């Protein structure tokens, strides 16, 4: 069954993670798992060039995200405009945990305003206190109702945060969910049925997780075959089609 991946990285993560993947390795993995195209970002705000190189080396395989750090101020905003307008990037990646800011902090406003002006989505890491909690992401969605926000990991590994991700997405129609790293397969079905059949996306978070692990969560979620196809493919296809130039 063909798939689209809503979240993956290219590059090396050192320290505790100790994982890495090249663009070539990622494409090989995609081919093996029938993943046609991937929403791709680098490892941080200092190596967006890796995403650009992957997009150039493998045309039509990636939607590129600008990994942005709002604490870098105007430098980050200008990089967003440059990569979106001149290098065909399709959105923004934020990680409040990595860069140590709260997900609804005012320092995000210039980045969110850029997303609104450029008509691009924002993908944001969720699930870790105190920076990346679903309630804070919901406040950001409330402040920018005309910017679509994808809550990566939909609360991640904590049951309370997973539940909050679903509750907040039900409250704010511009919040979407991506399920990589989230361990509860039943919550994929719950999101499909209660948040919206088109607002839950399959993702891998490569190289942190192998696609087959994430695939099994969708396959065993209790969804029908048609619904599984939505999560694996149609939902992200429809979502990203809004932003095609």
Spans of features found by a protein language model:
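Mobile, glycine- and charge-enriched loop segments
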Residues: 1-16, 54-64
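Catalytic pocket-lining loop regions of alpha/beta-barrel enzymes
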Residues: 104-201
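Conserved, mostly hydrophobic/aromatic
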Residues: 7, 30, 51, 83, ...
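Active-site gating/metal-coordination segments in enzymes
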Residues: 36-37, 45-123, 171, 175
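A general structural detector for well-ordered alpha-helical segments in enzyme core domains, enriched
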Residues: 22-29, 50-54, 79-83, 107-111, ...
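Hydrophobic faces of well-ordered beta-strands that scaffold small-molecule active sites
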Residues: 4-8, 38-40, 63-66, 90-94, ...
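Mid-to-C-terminal alpha-helical segments outside catalytic/metal-binding sites
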Residues: 1-6, 17-37, 197-199, 212-245
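Active-site environment of divalent metal-dependent phosphoester hydrolases
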Residues: 11-14, 45-48, 71-72, 99, ...
């Amino acid at each position: 069954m063909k798939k689209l991946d809503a979240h993956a990285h290219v590059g090396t993560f050192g320290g505790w993670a100790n994982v890495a993947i090249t663009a070539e390795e990622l494409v090989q993995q995609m081919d093996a798992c029938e993943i046609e195209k991937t929403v791709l970002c680098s490892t941080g705000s200092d190596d967006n060039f890796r995403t650009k190189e992957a997009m150039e080396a493998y045309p039509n395989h990636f939607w590129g995200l600008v990994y942005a750090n709002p604490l870098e101020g105007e430098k980050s905003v200008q990089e967003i405009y440059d990569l979106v307008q001149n290098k065909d990037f399709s959105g923004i990646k934020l990680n409040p945990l990595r860069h140590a800011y709260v997900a609804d902090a005012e320092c995000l406003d210039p980045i969110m305003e850029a997303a609104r002006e450029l008509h691009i989505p924002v993908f944001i890491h969720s699930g870790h206190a105190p920076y990346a909690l679903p309630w804070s992401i919901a406040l950001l969605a409330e402040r920018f109702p005309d910017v679509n926000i994808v809550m990566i990991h939909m609360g991640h590994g904590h049951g309370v945060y997973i539940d909050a991700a679903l509750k907040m997405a039900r409250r704010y129609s511009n919040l979407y969910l991506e399920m990589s790293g989230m361990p509860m397969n039943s919550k994929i079905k719950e999101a499909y049925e209660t948040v919206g059949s088109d607002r839950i996306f399959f993702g891998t978070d490569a190289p942190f997780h192998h696609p087959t692990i994430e695939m099994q969560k969708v396959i065993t979620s209790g969804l029908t075959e048609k619904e599984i196809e939505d999560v694996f493919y149609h939902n992200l296809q429809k979502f990203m089609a809004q932003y095609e130039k």
